[in-house]
Amino acid sequence: MAVSSIASIFAAEKSYSIPPVCQLLVSPVLNPLYDAKAESQIDAWCAEFLKLQPGSEKAVFVQESRLGLLAAYVYPTIPYEKIVPVGKFFASFFLADDILDSPEISSSDMRNVATAYKMVLKGRFDEATLPVKNPELLRQMKMLSEVLEELSLHVVDESGRFVDAMTRVLDMFEIESSWLRKQIIPNLDTYLWLREITSGVAPCFALIDGLLQLRLEERGVLDHPLIRKVEEIGTHHIALHNDLMSLRKEWATGNYLNAVPILASNRKCGLNEAIGKVASMLKDLEKDFARTKHEIISSGLAMKQGVMDYVNGIEVWMAGNVEWGWTSARYHGIGWIPPPEKSGTFQL
């Protein structure tokens, strides 16, 4: 599929509307311990990571993006000492994603950085520095290593689930970056296979287990088909909603690796019709989640220690991700004012 074929579908459409979704999930609740001090620490870390000048346009954008706020929405019960490390990790995830997608980074540098990040995840920082020659990337990699070391003090990951999930994300980032550079547009099924991993949801679900010290992996609970199903539903919901939110930003940079334009090209429909189909997919996922959650309760699986903490944690993640997507300026730009109804019309 060629990029030109996607661009031609939307040539006549200058605006699009996102309808309300997330109407069947639990209401999002902000962690009451998340305060201005925590947010300022995370913002300061982001500014140092990117070497931002105070008051610059990029610094204001990062500050209004409120990258640490996502942690407070999706982990509303964790204690204060865990909020900042998790917030920094989320921020590093977004910023590293931007770096790996940057045309200023050569494909060889990108491969070396992805390989180095995998070594950092396994605590092998000295080895990780060997393939990376760019001094700025080395500096950022050291900062990421420090964040992961701090995070490890608050997460139980004896099975290695979190590290394994992050490694898969980095593997798929390499594939995604290759597709972007070569302007390869996959079909919808192939894209959703990739997006399921590049969305980064798997390590974030692993953090539910690790931060709350549920030890579900060690006890074999995660192998149950119903648990696998709620994980799959949550992953697709988060990935698809993020694609709705990021469409305008990605469109402006010529990035067509998004469910909306790919679906439009596959189904031969316009932009707004494609958005309506994605919104309908989200609503179906929410209904499916409610049914599966009921099955977990009625089957007796909910009686196992930690199961409902995990299932409810996935639902909170889905709802919190929607809330943050409409609150943050990351997808909308400086001066963004969140609409109370979490829907709106946008200009391309």
Swiss-Prot record:
UniProt record similarity statement: Belongs to the terpene synthase family.
Known cofactor(s): Mg(2+)
Reaction(s) catalysed (UniProt annotation): (2E,6E)-farnesyl diphosphate = (+)-germacrene D + diphosphate
UniProt keyword Metal-binding present: yes
Additional record remark: Selaginella moellendorffii contains two distinct types of functional terpene synthases (TPS) genes, the typical seed plants TPS genes (SmTPSs) and a microbial type TPS genes (SmMTPSLs).
Domain text: The Asp-Asp-Xaa-Xaa-Asp/Glu (DDXXD/E) motif is important for the catalytic activity, presumably through binding to Mg(2+).
Pfam families named among the record's database cross-references: Terpene_syn_C_2
One GO process term, biological-process aspect: terpenoid biosynthetic process
Keyword terms: Lyase, Magnesium, Metal-binding
Purpose: Sesquiterpene synthase converting farnesyl diphosphate to eight sesquiterpenes, with (+)-germacrene D and an unidentified oxygenated sesquiterpene as the major products. Has no diterpene synthase activity.
PANTHER family to which the protein is assigned, alphabetical: BETA-PINACENE SYNTHASE-RELATED, TERPENE SYNTHASE
EC number: 4.2.3.77, 4.2.3.-
Motif (DDXXD motif): 97-101
Cofactor note (record): Binds 3 Mg(2+) ions per subunit.
Broad enzyme group: lyase
Binding sites annotated in the UniProt record for Mg(2+) 3: 242, 246
Native source organism of the sequence: Selaginella moellendorffii
List of residues binding Mg(2+) 2: 97, 101
Protein name: (+)-germacrene D synthase
